[in-house]
Amino acid sequence: MSRRLVALSTVATALDAERIATALVERGLAACVNVVPGVVSIYRWKGAVERDLELLLVIKTRADRFEALREALVSLHPYEVPELIALPVEAGHLPYLAWLDEATGEGRG
């Protein structure tokens, strides 16, 4: 069984958030993507400190799907350098974790 991950990304618009989230779930690269509006991002970009209102994508996936997820997200994302980081899931509700595995293709023939 592959390790489970929670991946994070941000986008500027609700349209982009829904488009990317839907594509990742439809392709079996994510079991679920939460879209969290109202995230204030403060970051350095091209020598200047920037501040933007963004939407956070909280993406539940498996480690063996991450590379395909990364390729898809980068191709769908409008940013020049999209944020994508992943954190390991150390524990969770076992029925939910089983569903995550099934929704991302674990055990399918």
Enumerate the predicted regions with their spans.
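Positively charged, small/polar-rich N-terminal and surface patches that mediate targeting and assembly
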Residues: 1-109
